[in-house]
Amino acid sequence: MFVMTGYAQCTLENHEKFEKGNRHNIGLFTLDNDHQKNIDQIKKFIKSLGWDSIEFYFTEEIHDKTTIKHETVRQGMKRAYKNGQSLIVDDTPIYLH
């Protein structure tokens, strides 16, 4: 399991949690060992969920899922094990200067 962290801009209209145009931290969980080669496919997946201007700044391999204690992260990993990949988004917008 790999987690790619970065940020993306919301493109969703009238979403209850996210305002269009705001940027948020994201975590993309994937089982794809070639995730760096398949970055276009990964970004297409994220765009299909209503996010754009996607930038990744860190990738980490998770060797032992039992060490993950944060429930949102655990749920994201669970969905990735089921579906091959999963996206989590931080509710709080970020502002880049």
Region annotations inferred by a language model:
Residues 1-31, 36, 40-56, 60, ...:
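Long, contiguous binding/interaction regions
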